[in-house]
Amino acid sequence: MNKLNKQIFGTLFFSIFAAVTGVGIVVPLLPVYAHDLGASGLYVGFIFGAFSLSRTFFLPYFGRLSDLKGRKPFIVPGFLAYALISVAFVYSNSVDSLIVIRFFHGIASAMLMPVIQAYIGDITPKGREGITMGMFNSSLFLGLSLGPLIGGTLKDHISLQGS
């Protein structure tokens, strides 16, 4: 991998790590907040399921669009949408709004993952695909590991409203 592609990989690695860590922070906080808003267990399931459902349907769509239009036009807008939608959690005051926010968060996530993975495939030299994708996925799962620990710590040591 040449120097520019290493920089691109590093940027994508840390960007995904940060984004997924943020999602992971929400995991232990969201059910508590939803319960405080009056959500039953079923509605907590809807809140979490909305993210995965929208992501499932939009992953192939954004993957295909990036095949047609290139990878770069989706990455920055995808991260921007992801960040802005994340801020919406702070202003959510109903169970229904949490479901809607999670639905759109899933769409923003779908705008990122297949595009970034394809971009990494594009810049990876032949014969290095496995190690490169393994390293990239380690950023994803490290974020999924650390995020809930951070969120749980926030929940235990700071009021939920402060989190």
Kindly label every feature range from the protein language model.
Residues 5-28:
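Pair of pore-lining "gating" transmembrane helices in MFS-fold secondary transporters
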Residues 29-38:
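Membrane-interface helix caps of multi-pass secondary transporters
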Residues 40-48, 133:
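Juxtamembrane helix-start elements in MFS-like secondary transporters
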Residues 52-60, 144-145:
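Residue-level signature of mid-helix packing/kink "hotspots" within the transmembrane helices
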Residues 57-93:
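Conserved MFS/SLC helix-loop-helix module at the cytosolic interface between two early adjacent transmembrane helices
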Residues 85, 96-104:
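Paired small-residue
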Residues 101-140:
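Cytoplasmic helix-loop-helix junction between adjacent transmembrane helices
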Residues 136-163:
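Helix-loop-helix hairpin linking two adjacent transmembrane segments in secondary transporters
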